Amino acid sequence: MAMARKRRERKVHQYLSGLDAVASARVEVHPEFSEPDRWTVDVRLKDDPSKGSVVTVVRDAYAKVLNLTGANEVRMVVTWVKGKTFVFCYLPIKDADKAASATVEALSPGMERVQIEEERISFEYRTTETLPDHFILPPSSAVLRLGSLRVEQSILIGRSHCFISHAKGKDLTSVPIKRALETIPSDKRYGAVLSLEAEDYNSHQARLIFKKWVNDWQDEDVQADAAVLATVLGNQVLQRVELLTSVESKVQPRVVGFDMKSGTVVGQGDPPEKGAPILAAAQQPDASS
């Protein structure tokens, strides 16, 4: 068994090392007593590979490795560098060749790390002081046409985090996320999080979540919440806005939610005693300036 295992391991390494696009390969097999052997394969492509080279390795090489090992499944990671962007593709995944091809098309210089995984494609951007224009991926992007994988974007803007979670068929580009970030008062930006979700897990609504930190509940005021809410009043895409306030010593944040329809807030918020003053402040002419 050990000799046969070593022979298969050597064949896999020889095959991968012989591919033109491959810079290096590492193959490991972990014997299991009562389960099939576990195979892990790390493949590093040559820098700046073409889309065709990436697709060939992700699709054809994985199938060949399965055949050579005789295993039902192999955990394989294909990595490469495009410009200054590091890309990691974790196999197996559904429609791996399509996911890899679409990801290569979506790469841009501002991206630092990209991961293609079983359920999602995540784009992590380099820290900057201002959110780039046209940051939100448009529906025309190839990765958003896949449908089988979630697509997420994340970036650190100064001291605030911004996350975008997409869904097939949902266009988020009209949501003024950049303006919302810029309206957060400077004393509330440290650790603040602004998340835009095309579909939340429960109600499948387009939702904006703003989370800020305060030292004590006594420091809570409506200014930051009202500023963020004001930027999205009138937006036709958002169906809900949630404003969260956390105190470092407390586990559960306080949440004020607003349902929206056709750009207008429905009711006074939930709970209304917290939502009403925020909404009133957000509706002032200079609320988002």
Predicted regions and their residues:
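Hydrophilic extracytoplasmic domains
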Residues: 237-289
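Intrinsically disordered, low-complexity segments enriched in Gly and acidic/Ser/Thr residues
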Residues: 170-255
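Short amphipathic alpha-helices in soluble, non-transmembrane regions
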Residues: 15, 54-65, 103-105, 134-146, ...
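Acidic helix-start/capping segments at beta-turn-to-alpha-helix junctions
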Residues: 30-38, 73-88, 159, 245-252
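Extracytoplasmic low-complexity, Pro/Thr/Ser/Ala/Gly-rich segments
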Residues: 1-53, 96-106, 176-188, 279-289
